[in-house]
């Protein structure tokens, strides 16, 4: 029996255990909640985008956005539904996001479900627009701080990273393009693009979590044009002096043409030592082409026919035809037009260039003065439909972005990758099967032809051998070519034997057959003479024997 004194102790232990479990669960839930709260902005598109994302009202943007599932998944995204259209849609943030302090991570997924031959799949992170701007007015002229994402058309194949920066001296915004950006993946799988903007002026571009490019905002080697302008510029008002001599070399003014310099001597002269080759056919010029005249040529309507000339057939074996002329050769006395040699120009001043002046647009800074992100927009033109945007994220920590990649993108990608692998294996198997069936069909036709060859009358003596070879080939298809060659050799051998060496044996066989018939007839008349005739026949036609070799 259970001791009643132990019941309170057991209940206490159970309560402690339940509290521990509850505390652990609460801890994990809080951690997950904290992780979500760390995202400045996140759009999963699990719910319809209507009334949250605003489609541009501009007439040129006639592409239809749809809330659609990614192919093969239950996960929804924002879909480009029609090809050869312009698209524009925007989502205003609850509060502007500063890009100046600390790390900022921009991340989103795209899936090019029908590929991308010519079009964009990038996102624009818009700056605060002018007063009175409405999301319905979003277009290509709407200012952005950063443009990031895939773009492909013709020779262009890159993941854009462009930032717009306001010049503090001029007030103008300048686009600065990342040099040598990474390429866009060429498959139709989901891919996640991440840009990590760090406080040390570095930016890292990741594709599927793997760093593909690192750059520095202040480096002229990483961005074109450079963020910080040059200190000086060529003076636009400076002009080259009229007496500025840029010629490094000039003709020697004191040089004199030699007296024996013959400018009129020709480059080539007739070779007087040449002799006419024998047998040169002097009286065999080109002849009319007898086959050139069209059959429907009518002299009355089309005029008198003038046949084109062709080479005289008699000239094929001769060194030449027609009138022979001596060839020309290089003239050893040829010098050409005389010109004075060049000397260093004593007045040479070098290649002129305008003088440098202070650049009025020059400024210095330690960090880019990014304008905050006030909205997220997609403004693209594409020839392909099926582009799906999903899981748009802005965060202050790249660990948050990594967590989202692991939980939202990677499971989908793994499924798609496995499916792609199976499809490629199936396609390879189908191609191999098709190739095998094609080869099998060719082999069947080849063997059918070989059987027909075996039935040719003059091959009757070799028919069994040929059939045996063919049947062996049918059992071992990889020997088909060898079998064909073997049969062709047999065929050609017998054919040549028949054409070039078969007449005499045929006559001998006819004579033997004739004598055999006569012998049989005579044997009926006189049985005693049968053996005598046989001996005479053997004496007259002794069999050919191979000489024996001494071992």
Curated annotation (Swiss-Prot):
InterPro entries (UniProt xref): Calret/calnex, Calret/calnex_CS, Calreticulin/calnexin_P_dom_sf, ConA-like_dom_sf
UniProt entry keywords in alphabetical sequence: Calcium, Chaperone, Disulfide bond, Endoplasmic reticulum, Glycoprotein, Lectin, Membrane, Metal-binding, Repeat, Signal, Transmembrane, Transmembrane helix
Stretches with biased composition (Basic and acidic residues): 234-269, 276-295, 526-539
Cytoplasmic side: 502-551
Ranges per topology, Lumenal: 27-480
Family matches, as SUPFAM superfamilies: Concanavalin A-like lectins/glucanases, P-domain of calnexin/calreticulin
Main location: endoplasmic reticulum
Topology class, membrane: Single-pass type I membrane protein
Binding-site residues, an alpha-D-glucoside: 122, 124, 144, 151, 379
Biological processes, Gene Ontology terms: ERAD pathway; protein folding
Disulfide bond entries: 118-153, 315-321
Region 4 X approximate repeats, annotated ranges: 235-299, 303-360
Biased composition regions of type Acidic residues, renumbered to the chain: 296-305
Residues in Sequence repeats: 235-246, 252-263, 271-282, 289-299, 303-313, 322-332, 336-346, 350-360
Chain residues that bind Ca(2+): 44, 75, 390
Glycosylation sites recorded in the entry for this protein: 140, 478
Similarity comment text for this entry: Belongs to the calreticulin family.
PANTHER family per record: CALNEXIN HOMOLOG (PTHR11073:SF59), CALRETICULIN AND CALNEXIN (PTHR11073)
Protein name: Calnexin homolog
Annotated source species: Pisum sativum (Garden pea)
